[in-house]
Amino acid sequence: MDPPSKKRSIFGGITSLFRSSTAPPEDRKGKSTNSNSVTANAPSLPPPQPESNGASSPFSPAKRASEAQLSVRKIIPKPQGPSSKLSQSVSASEIAHRPAPSTPAPAAATPVPKRRPGDNPHKLAASTSTPALQNLPNPPAPATSSKATSFSGAPSTPRPSIFRNSLYARPAPATTYTQRVSSHPLTQSFPPVTPGRPGRAANVDINNRILSNTASTELFPMKIPEPPRHLTGEMLAKEVPEDPNRAGSIYADEYLAHLCPPEFDDLQRRQFFCILDLRRLKYAADEVFLKKDWKINILNFAKEYEKSRSLIMLRYGLYEFKTVRASEAVKREWKLKHGIPDSDDESGAPAKTNGGGKRKAEEDLEPSSSTFTHTASPNKRARATEAPATNKRKANDELEEESQPSKLQKPGSPSPAKTPSATKSVFESIANKTASPQTAPKSSLFSSSTAAKPNGSIFDNAQKTPATSSNIFGHLSDASKDEDNESDTGSEAEAEDETPAKKKKKTTVNGASSSAPSEGGESTQSRSIFDRITRDANGQPVRQLPEGGLFSGESRKRSLSPVKELPANNTWNASAGIKFATPGTSSIFGSSNPKPPATTDTIDFAASTTKKPEEAAAPAEAPKEATPTTNLFGAQTKATEEAPKPAATNIFGSTTNPTETSIPAGSLFSAKPATSTTNSLFGATTSAAGQKKDEESKPTEAAPAPAPATSTLFGAKPATTESPKTNLFQFGTPNKTETAPATQPQFGGLFGKPPSTETPTEKPATTSLFGTDASKPATTSSLFGSATTAADKPAATNLFGSTTTPADKPTTTNLFGSTSTQATSGSDEPTAKKFAFGGTTESKPTTSLFGSTTPAPATSTENKGGLFGATTTSATPATNTKPLFGSTPAPAQENKPLFGSSTTTAAPVFQFGSTPASTSTEQKPLFGATAATDSKPLFGSTSATSTEQKPLFGSSTTMTEQKPLFGSISTTATEQKPLFGSTSTTEAKPLFGAAPASTEQKSLFGITPSTTENNPASIFGNSSTSTEQKPLFGSAPASTEQKPLFGSTPSTTENKPAGLFGNTSTTSTSTPLFNFGSQNTTASQPSTTGSIFGSASASFTFTAGGSDGTIKNPFASDGSYSAPTSFNFGSGDSQSSSAPFTFGAGGGTPSFTFGASSDSSNASNNASSAPIFSFGASQPSSTPLFGQNNPPAASNIFASSLAPVGGTSTGTSKHVPSFLESENKASAYSSLDSPFTFGGASSLATTPAASTPEPSAANAAAAGEDQGASADADEQPQEQISLTDGGPGEEDESVVHEVRAKAVKLVTAADSSADSSNGSGEKPAEKKSNSPWKVMGVGPLRLLKHKQTGAVRMLLRAEPRGNIALNKLVLPQFTYKPDAATPKFIKFAAARDDGKGLETWMIQVKTPQLAQELAAALEEHKKANEKKDGEKNEESEKKDEKQEEKKNEEKKDEKEEKKDEKK
């Protein structure tokens, strides 16, 4: 027989969980449960399977323990699994001796055959061993003895179960083998490898202890009998309907509702289905557990099981929620979701304190309202943040506390009662709101307190206050040590022990309630964290409590004897101000605010000055005010006493409350008061309006004398009798003529609007950073400096330099240079305060940074040059520098700024403009406009004077002026023509600008007229006159003026040596070396010094060539003759004696020349005199190298001349650029293509042939002539473009159809010669080719429709160069369709180029479909040309018009050249 099989289960106790029993159903009280019956707690469980314990198998050969041995062993209670009900199983003895189903009886009452913990509950009396016989009604007797031992060695004592003990007979399972696993592994060891081997004692002892003490709990109280046993988990799992679309779990009530008895109510029905689902869960768990073979995480598996079971019970409403305290994170999230403050939980249960001790730094630094308003018990005081308790106290510590020698007694206390709690006193005083007649003066938030001396640290300024105030850092301060032995729970005793004066302030016993609980945390402060211990003269620590107002208040020294009565009640209330000022220290931001009348309570965050004991004893008396301390933000808090105190320095220097008599504290940015010598950072402080003079400014006895003044950061200094210290950023010198200080200095705002005060006439002007002054006589310069003018005050210079200068006062220089002036002068007025970036109070006006300044009267003795040169000008000549960008009214001798116009004679450091010839000798600003006598700025427009130079790019209006480089000017005979501007025909044209008349020399950037003086030629341009230098880019005026570096000078008769590259006049004058502008030459003087590279004529010039002053196109032929202007950047005047740019040729033929050789003496020998190696065409005259105006005689090695120049098929000549066609019409190669040429109408040329009616040739020709107006365009980088996308003539046309095609033309014998020079880019047809068709080009074929006329033409540009292969009108008389034999071809007729006759063409496309589409497009658009048959081609009309325009321009140029030559 097979070894006994058994089925292991997951949470089995003695047996597997949830086994179906055969006992009839019985009452819940009859505690016998079936292991298969699913409790209400257990999820649906695996179906009950027959189990047999290998250890108890009768076939096991192992020796069993005797009955006596088993009886003496310890009986271990049945283990409890995740579900106590489900983990209980039924013993075999209960099954064998079970009463009737109707009579419930406890299972333990049938002890006949003993069941061991390892026994299989399905065995009948432990006698049937095989699974096949287990479930039979009458199983056979076992073959061996029925003794059964468990691994634990103890008989089982089954517990009552809520399920019935009936076990219905089931068919035997198909298999007989199960895993060798204990049926209750939670409490017993695993079975050994040998099925019958008993467990060892060690294993028994260890494993039996695991879950033996687990208490069983019912999942829910049963209201129904146990469901039928046959409804096992396995059967229920099989009953689940198969639904592939089901998502989620399915429950028993959804598909097993028919199994529920109809008499059940809702609760019973839910319990019934819950038990069924728990059985199904148990079955599923067992299946998983068995299949995994113990290789799963048992803890996670158990958690998942419990989770599933709980979900089932929750589904049926049977889950009993446990009272588990939620975690802080869960509570916080829940509160946040429901909008509940986080402090609600803490207020309900205040944290328990440990009676004091050192507190952690992060503990309750901010007060909470809940800590003030709630106490857990009447004996406990709520923990307040301000509580000064520091250590644990015992109840009997009060006696010890009273005996302490250093303990301070309550002032005025008749008995030695201990000092009350500071926190309690504060809360009670706030609740009572008993304001004393004398309250602490109200102060602004940033006002400084009155302190006799500065404290060393901002943390040391928190002074000791009376017991009415507490410190939020009280646990760190000495105030908390005063109550070392007090208990947190002793507040009632404290309340009783306090004096009547204190008790009348209290409303609550425990001090926890407050009228303003949220403010209580902010209303207390005591000793500083760094000043915790105060020691007396003997070195013993002195216990002192904070006194006075909250966070401040006058502190007074106390002796160890009983102290005197407290001064006024300085308790803070909700209406009180807050003072953060630190006593005695300089304010960083320095606005000192006088104290208002003491009408409200104040929280003073600065320590007050220490008072004498007798002073502190006077409660109704206001505290004496000492020297005011400097506030961090500078609001000075001033008291209402008559005794004024010196003002503290405010860093930002705005002082308020002008009604006070005390002197305001100096602000860092404020103007200093007369007596206060401390300077503000930005230096303007505003004193109170009603300040008295020096007798009232004296401090009281308690106040020390004011310290010497410190300079402000940005330096507006008050006028004091003592010499002020220098400013931090002061760039100006201090005022030498300081007078008696005014009582109220005016404050210059940071951006220059100072607050207005009542006595403006008494305030000195301070310089503001941006130099805008308030509308007062005594003003400070604002940073950007629009300052108000006064009659006689010194004006501060603004950075950008608009100043209003008074008559006779020294001006203070502002950073941006606008100075403010003061109204009155007097011995008692302070001078202007030094500005941070250079405003001075000296009598000498200084220049503004950009500074156009108004001229000052003659009293100003010195002008300081601003950074950019705007100055305040005075009558003193030649001392002012000009502002960089600003314009100044010009006194005759002022220095000009770099970019601004000024009126001084001093030249700026970097002068870019030429100086005028006027007697004022003023320099012109680079960009600015100046007065009429000034020289013109480089880029600016100036007013017109006859001697003025024109700006480089600006326009001018005078006839004698030189024209700007790029600007357009009025057309007069003597003006230059701009490069791009239109000028009159009589003017010479410079390269980029308007050229002057013929009397002036043309320069690249300007005009240099020739003079008679012997000056060495400039290396780059025409020489200037003898006395002046030329500016770098500007044009120089008359002979007394400096000449620009590249500019032209007026023409004189001076002798100049020939320049290196330059054009020289034909007189004895020499041309400048490297001339960028051609000079006007006179034909009367033939003797010229030869240039190093060529003739005396400026052969290497970059300006207009010839006498007409126009720019010659280096690549275009001149209209008068066919010789091209080879590389002409500007033709010079024609001379007979000049040689082309040669490296040493004298009068003979140059051996190596870059230009055309000129041989005026023998014009007939041009062929012999041609240069050996010439880059340009030879010429018979001495024209410049880059601009030849005469016909050449020598051939060019790079340009073979071809015969028909510009000839078209119609016989009309057309002008094309010189580099495209040859100039030698007599060349022998006229009918051939020259591959090595820069000119000539060969097939390699980049423009269409003459026979093509494409207007691009005409456009190119016109553009070649128009190059004179845009010579620099030749040097611009060219973008990479597609040459086939479009070209000239297509601007007014739209593409109606486009396809890539090949144009093929039928060429006859008569046409072959005419087509030899076509522009299609194709070679002529070879003789050997017998085909009459010639491919003209492949590329995009476009049907173009004119936007105005509507004419439609076919245009095909051959790839890759874009030359015209096909350009024909669509004839409406023909039908366009693909050829029948070759569907990719469309054959059509078109008019010839000369209009005589027709031609046959074919267009080949890639596919027949494309051919169909092209034919359809041609048919569609040919109607537009029906009325156009007799008209000329539109393109030819454009060509003719452009040719006419070109001819007109050439004639115009010739006339201008003749006029220039005559001049």
UniProtKB/Swiss-Prot annotation:
BP term (GO), one: mRNA transport
**Superkingdom, taxonomy of origin:** Eukaryota
- Compositional bias of kind Low complexity: 511-523, 616-630, 753-768, 803-813, 870-881, 1156-1170, 1240-1271
Task: Write out the biased-composition intervals (Polar residues).
Answer: 32-42, 81-92, 144-155, 175-191, 367-378, 416-472, 651-664, 673-689, 720-746, 777-789, 814-828, 840-863, 900-923, 940-961, 968-987, 998-1029, 1037-1055, 1179-1199
Q: Which CDD domains does the UniProt record give?
A: RanBD_NUP50 (cd13170)
Annotated spans, Disordered = 1-199, 339-568, 609-1064, 1155-1174, 1179-1217, 1240-1335, 1416-1463
List the GO cellular component terms: nuclear membrane; nuclear pore
Give me the disulphide-bonded residues.
none
Q: Which residues form the RanBD1 domain?
A: 1289-1427
The record's annotation in InterPro entries points to:
NPC_Nucleoporin (IPR053074), Nucleoporin_FG_rpt (IPR025574), PH-like_dom_sf (IPR011993), Ran_bind_dom (IPR000156)
Coiled-coil positions:
none
Query: Compositional bias of type Acidic residues: which residue ranges?
Result: 481-498
Identify the keywords attached in UniProt to this record, alphabetized: Membrane, mRNA transport, Nuclear pore complex, Nucleus, Protein transport, Repeat, Translocation, Transport
Protein topology in the membrane: Peripheral membrane protein
| A Pfam family reported for this protein in Swiss-Prot or TrEMBL | Nucleoporin_FG
| Localization of this protein | Nucleus, Nuclear pore complex; Nucleus membrane
**Tell me, what does this protein do in biology?**
Functions as a component of the nuclear pore complex (NPC). NPC components, collectively referred to as nucleoporins (NUPs), can play the role of both NPC structural components and of docking or interaction partners for transiently associated nuclear transport factors. Active directional transport is assured by both, a Phe-Gly (FG) repeat affinity gradient for these transport factors across the NPC and a transport cofactor concentration gradient across the nuclear envelope (GSP1 and GSP2 GTPases associated predominantly with GTP in the nucleus, with GDP in the cytoplasm).
Domain writeup: Contains FG repeats. FG repeats are interaction sites for karyopherins (importins, exportins) and form probably an affinity gradient, guiding the transport proteins unidirectionally with their cargo through the NPC. FG repeat regions are highly flexible and lack ordered secondary structure. The overall conservation of FG repeats regarding exact sequence, spacing, and repeat unit length is limited.
Give the multimer and partner information. The nuclear pore complex (NPC) constitutes the exclusive means of nucleocytoplasmic transport. NPCs allow the passive diffusion of ions and small molecules and the active, nuclear transport receptor-mediated bidirectional transport of macromolecules such as proteins, RNAs, ribonucleoparticles (RNPs), and ribosomal subunits across the nuclear envelope.
This chain belongs to the protein called Nucleoporin NUP152
Q: Which species is this UniProt entry from?
A: Chaetomium thermophilum (strain DSM 1495 / CBS 144.50 / IMI 039719)
Q: What is the lineage of its organism?
A: Eukaryota, Fungi, Dikarya, Ascomycota, Pezizomycotina
